Amino acid sequence: GYIGDITSVKASIYLTQAVARAVISRAPTTTPSINTMTYLVDLLTWFSGKRPISAYASGAKGVFYEEFGALDSTWTVLNFDGGMVATLGASWEVPVFWPANNASMEFEVFGREGAVSVKDDHRDMVIASNKSMPGPYTPEVDMHVALFGSNMPGDWALGEHFGAMQEETHAFINSVGQRRQDSILATGRDGFDVLSISLAIDQSANTGEVVPITWTS
């Protein structure tokens, strides 16, 4: 491919405090790593086809730590066999009025032959209005400036839903009906691997130690 063998990855994802509060109100034991960074870990393992052998992480203690005992942000370094390294970060620290409707995400992949940089915060599509707009994930929060396309499941327009959730739902229905694995759908093993990595990241953030990650298959 045009990138060649992947040598490093840098990625980050931010939720507003309003979205993070909605998340933790439903799952009191969740963390930025398990709930939010998991998207980055999933993409990382999918893009690279590799699983890390160790995790080192550290986290910030702020509003969410005081109220819920959860870290406000988590930043990690993952090491892989062959020398590949990834730096990932997840934050719940941006204020309620941050213009992303759901999440702000960036993902960069560097290889021997090239690099890819994706800015998935959609800052190129902005709406501003004197009228307040409800956030799609947190409708109780009124926004006057918002980034179109920053709601991860997609957006409603003219009574129809467009975006990733629509495509994933159709793929799931087709897979069940046709008894085949669609290439855009994760497997149970994929989910298990991502959760194992996320738990290792949390363990490192809590202990301050490098956590080895072993794989049996």
Regions found by a protein language model. Name each.
Residues 197-207:
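Short arginine-rich
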Residues 75, 80-82, 98, 104-189, ...:
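C-terminal glycine/acidic-rich active-site capping loop/insertion
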Residues 49, 174-178, 206:
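Residues at helix-coil transition
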Residues 38, 64, 90-97:
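Glycine-rich phosphate/pyrophosphate-binding beta-alpha loops
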Residues 6-9, 87-90, 118-119:
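Beta-strand scaffold of nucleotide-dependent catalytic cores
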Residues 12-17, 61, 92, 113-115, ...:
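Short, flexible active-site-adjacent loop segments at beta-strand->alpha-helix junctions, enriched
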Residues 1-69, 74, 208:
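Predominantly a Rossmann-like dinucleotide-binding segment in NAD(P)-dependent oxidoreductases
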Residues 34, 38-42, 163-170, 189-196:
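A structural signal for well-ordered alpha-helical segments within the folded catalytic domains
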